Each structure stands twice: as C-alpha cells, then as structure tokens.
C-alpha cells in the first residue's frame, strides 16, 4: 500500500511536496514589494520528510513505505514593472523517494507558475505603514509527469487559477504583521485508471482535483540588515474524499493541513542586493497528508539594471 504525500498549495501557486518554500525573498504571497525596474533572482533548495501520515483524520505509519522524502530546487524571478505592480515566474524541479518498499520515486520539472502582485493601498502615519496587495496567478505542468502515482508523483497535473489578498502592517519599531489568504481553482485531469471513489464509484478516467483555500499569519521584524518571522499557515480543500483503509491515495483526496514555522533573511554586507534566506516548518494537523517537516535555504539577488548612477 502507498501513503499520501504532503501536497499543500502555498501562497496560491502549485508547490507540491514541499511546504512553505516561500522564504523571505520578495514573493507573490508576502507583504513586501519591489520598486520600478528592480529584478529579484532567487534559487531555493528544500527538503520535506515524513514518516507518519493522516489516513483521513487517523494518524498512522506505513512500514512498507518507511520515511518519505521530497527534494526540490526552485528558481524564481521577480520584476518590478512599476512601483505598484510586480511580476513573478517560478519553476520547481522535484525528486521523490522513500526508504522502504519496492516503489521507485519520480523526478522532473513540475509546474510553471506565473503571477502578478498589485499594491492597492498604502497608508502611512506616525506609527507605521499599512499595505493592501492583490495577487493573481496561473500555473500549468511543463513536463509529462504522472499525477496519479501518489505519494511519488511530483505534482497533481492540474492547471490552476488563483487570487489572493494580502494585508501587511509595518510599525515604526520595525516589527511587522501580515495576513494573507487566497483561493485556487484547479482543472480536471486525465488518469490511467477507469474509475475512482467519490461517495461511490465513478466510472471515468477524468478526475476532478479539489480547489484549495489557504492562508497565513506572520509576525516578524525587518530592518536593513536582516528579517525574521514566525508564521502559521493553513490549506483546506473545498471537496474531495478521504483515503480509505488499505487503499492507495489519488488526486481527488481531500488534503488539509496546518503548519507552523520560522524563517529569516540576512543581507550580505558589502554586496548590495545579495541575501541568504532559510525557513523551517512542521505540520501540526492534517487530513490525508503527511506529518511533514520541511526546511529550505536559498540565495537571492535584487538589482536594478535600469537605474542611472548618481552623477
């Protein structure tokens, strides 16, 4: 028997197997923005591992699977089209494996995500500054991977359309708080199976993938040298079925998760725009997902090739 992998959508774009890979670079889901002409280049490496998983709401192990592991490299690019609108592109490469059993993991390029973040409101007073951002995004597979081979699949194979609202407040003491939430629509997919379970047998090879509502709360500190935060995230499928006892998972399963974590960013002295960032997250509650621990680390470089040097 196979178990379910941790498949949680962050931030409104398709990030399967690895949670909370949105570290402290400028991203579509945070409360920070690039100025006009700025380019942000990011490369992240991350790893997720889990041994226990929720079969429905029951937490259990599977000795035939052992410890499941997913590794990911994700390049990302961001561009400040103007002082209000930022554009982003991301494409993760994922490799999956387990320590027991006879199943072979999968690897490859997953889904290309394209998104835009718009600064709708900026209000400043003597105590701090309040921002409201709106984010919209799409994603689609770029390789012919198999989605119905969980937990080893590198993705669910669905095209997505997402929208998000971000509320961000920065106090004059450099403390900040962020709340963001979004909804992701997912397309149906075609599988090799001829039927699946949805409160009864459905005789079709076309399978719906549940939409997702997700969000996060962050509290942190940000200055010109470094940034740190602690966060709580959730992701909830709006439909789907539970993994049945002694049955294999599939993309229509209802996948819910809550996780907590910390992350940070350090600007490198002497190299303008260069920073290192890292994060660590632990799933604390779930449904049809792995009880996973995820860590990530990466490097980012922010520069403006169009800005004229001061005379």
For every predicted segment, state its role.
Residues 29-37, 84, 122-131, 173-174, ...:
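Short loop/turn motifs that connect adjacent beta-strands in outer-membrane beta-barrel proteins
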Residues 36-42, 86, 90, 109-113, ...:
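Outer-membrane beta-barrel architecture
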Residues 37, 69-73, 107-114, 130, ...:
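Residues that define the transmembrane beta-barrel architecture of outer-membrane proteins
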Residues 43, 75-79, 89, 114-118, ...:
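Residues on the lipid-exposed face of transmembrane beta-strands in outer-membrane beta-barrel proteins
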Residues 45-51, 91-97, 120, 138-144, ...:
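Transmembrane beta-strands of outer-membrane beta-barrel pores
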Residues 47-72, 148-153:
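Surface-exposed strand-loop-strand hairpins of Gram-negative outer-membrane beta-barrel proteins
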Residues 54-63, 201-311:
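Outer membrane beta-barrel transmembrane domains
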Residues 102-207, 249:
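Outer-membrane pore/translocation modules
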């Amino acid at each position: 028997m196979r178990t379910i992998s941790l498949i949680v959508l962050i931030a409104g774009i398709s990030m399967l197997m690895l949670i909370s890979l949105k570290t402290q670079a400028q991203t579509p889901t945070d409360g920070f923005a690039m100025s006009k002409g700025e380019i942000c280049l990011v490369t992240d490496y991350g790893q997720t591992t889990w041994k226990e998983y929720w079969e429905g709401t029951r937490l259990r192990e599977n000795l035939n699977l052992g410890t499941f592991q997913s590794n990911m490299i994700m390049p990302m690019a961001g561009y400040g089209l103007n002082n209000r609108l930022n554009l982003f592109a991301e494409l993760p490469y994922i490799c999956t494996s387990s320590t027991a059993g006879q199943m072979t993991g999968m690897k490859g390029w997953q889904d290309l995500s394209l998104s835009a973040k718009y600064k709708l409101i900026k209000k400043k007073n003597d105590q701090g500054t309040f921002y409201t951002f709106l984010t919209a995004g799409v994603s689609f597979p770029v390789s012919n991977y198999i989605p119905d081979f969980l937990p080893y699949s590198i993705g669910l194979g669905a095209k997505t359309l997402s929208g998000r609202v971000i509320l961000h407040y920065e106090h004059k003491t450099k403390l900040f708080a962020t709340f963001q939430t979004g909804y992701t629509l997912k397309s149906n997919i075609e599988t090799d199976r001829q039927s699946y379970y949805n409160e009864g047998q459905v005789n079709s090879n076309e399978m719906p993938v549940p939409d997702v509502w997700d969000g996060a709360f962050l509290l942190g500190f940000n200055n010109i040298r470094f940034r740190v935060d602690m966060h709580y995230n959730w992701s909830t499928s709006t439909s789907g079925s539970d993994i049945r006892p002694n049955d294999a998972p599939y993309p229509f399963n209802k996948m819910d998760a809550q996780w907590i974590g910390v992350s940070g960013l350090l600007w490198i002295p002497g190299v303008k725009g260069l920073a290192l960032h890292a994060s660590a997250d632990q799933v604390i509650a779930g449904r049809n997902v792995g009880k996973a621990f995820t860590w990530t680390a990466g490097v980012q470089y922010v520069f403006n090739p169009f800005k004229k040097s001061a005379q």
